[in-house]
Swiss-Prot record:
The gene is MBLAC2. Palmitoylated on Cys-254 by ZDHHC20. Binds 2 Zn(2+) ions per subunit. This is Acyl-coenzyme A thioesterase MBLAC2. Acyl-CoA thioesterases are a group of enzymes that catalyze the hydrolysis of acyl-CoAs to the free fatty acid and coenzyme A (CoASH), providing the potential to regulate intracellular levels of acyl-CoAs, free fatty acids and CoASH. Has an acyl-CoA thioesterase activity towards the long chain fatty acyl-CoA thioester palmitoyl-CoA (hexadecanoyl-CoA; C16:0-CoA). Displays a substrate preference for fatty acyl-CoAs with chain-lengths C12-C18. It is an enzyme of class 3 (hydrolase). It comes from Bos taurus (Bovine).
Amino acid sequence: MSALEWYAHKSLGDGIFWIQERFYESGNRANIWLVRGSEQDVVIDTGLGLRSLPEYLYSSGLLRDRAARDNAACRPLLAVATHVHFDHSGGLYQFDRVAVHHAEAEALARGDNFETVTWLSDSEVVRAPSPGWRARQFRVQAVQPTLVLQDGDVINLGDRQLTVMHMPGHSRGSICLHDKDRKILFSGDVVYDGSLIDWLPYSRISDYVGTCERLIELVDRGLVEKVLPGHFNTFGAERLFRLASNYISKAGICHKVSTFAMRSLASLALRVTNSRTSP
């Protein structure tokens, strides 16, 4: 299957494109965002990486065609992972320039498929990307980040800037990217319109509460009008406020006890199926 078949996209205007993996039918299917700038283009999250995402970007015309890739006028391309979970980081190995938060840089560099929580089934991939492909073969490949991010860093695209916000809770290195001028938040799995997951090996409820308080502050200060999340549909500031507030209100003792049990089971299952280093 070609990259043009595997991916699909739609334009949200203002240089932003929403890309998805058509034949990965799962709640884990991540949104991939392309943000075009005057001096640099940024891909936010890369999906599973079962087909070449860079090839799709050039072949579909979203970026300059392959013949122009080495041209001095061709803008550089940076792939940013909002966190290293497999559904977001699987395609990072396809890019020359890769950025991730420092808390997860080591896990990515060694191909730690326990921390990337790799968990994929044949039933979720409704058309095999290549003959004989099986989900049990899938692993997140080790990638050495070329840019290690910290809270407050700014990724300069020329005519727009994306500010890095370290937002742990879902994972220890989760980030949002905030376009302050346009009041857009690329939220990864920090927040999306669904049940927030805080029971994975490196999830932490206390961190998540702090993150949600920070999200509420963004809304209260009028700094976010649109959220482009890591899963499901986009939403606005009012919904962001409600999702963050609901998480805080539910993060009591009962929730912590049930989450501890779920995390223990998830960690056991992931340790059985995944190694801490890439083969």
